[in-house]
Amino acid sequence: MAENRRMKKVNAMLREAIAKVILKDVKHPKISNRWITITRVSLSRDLQSACVYVSIMPHENSQEETLAALKASAGFIAFQASKDLVLKYFPDLNFYVEDIFSPQDHIESLLLKIAEQDKKTNP
C-alpha cells in the first residue's frame, strides 16, 4: 500500500515537472504554442521508464507531428525536469497520445441514438 501511494506521488510530481518544462523550456515550433495537456504519467516498477500520456488539441499540425516532436525532445524534457525533481535515476520518457474526447463523443452519439429511437416509439 505504501509503495502504491509512493508511486502515485512520484507520478504526480513527474507530471507536474514535465508539464512545466513543456510550457516554459521547450522551444520546438511544433510543440510551443500548442495546447498540450499531460493527462497522466505511468512510471514503471523499476522507475527506469515512464509513459507520458498527452492530449493534443487539434491545430494546423497533426497530432502525429506534435507527438513526433515530443518524442524527439524527450531527452531534453527529461534533463530539464530532472533539475526540479530529486530522483536517484530519472526515467526515460515515452510519449503517447491519449484521446480524451473520443469516449465523450461515443457517449454523445449513443445518447442521440436513444433520443431518436424514443421519438420514433413515442411520437
From Swiss-Prot:
Keyword vocabulary terms for this entry: Cytoplasm, Ribosome biogenesis
Gene3D superfamilies referenced in this protein's UniProt entry, alphabetically: 3.30.300.20
Keyword Cytoplasm: yes
One biological process term in Gene Ontology: maturation of SSU-rRNA
Keyword Cytoplasm tagged: yes
Gene Ontology CC entries for this record: cytosol
Function field: One of several proteins that assist in the late maturation steps of the functional core of the 30S ribosomal subunit. Associates with free 30S ribosomal subunits (but not with 30S subunits that are part of 70S ribosomes or polysomes). Required for efficient processing of 16S rRNA. May interact with the 5'-terminal helix region of 16S rRNA.
Assembly, per entry: Monomer. Binds 30S ribosomal subunits, but not 50S ribosomal subunits or 70S ribosomes.
Family statement: Belongs to the RbfA family.
Stored PANTHER family: RIBOSOME-BINDING FACTOR A, CHLOROPLASTIC-RELATED (PTHR33515:SF1)
Name of this protein: Ribosome-binding factor A
Native source species: Chlamydia trachomatis serovar D (strain ATCC VR-885 / DSM 19411 / UW-3/Cx)
Gene designation: rbfA
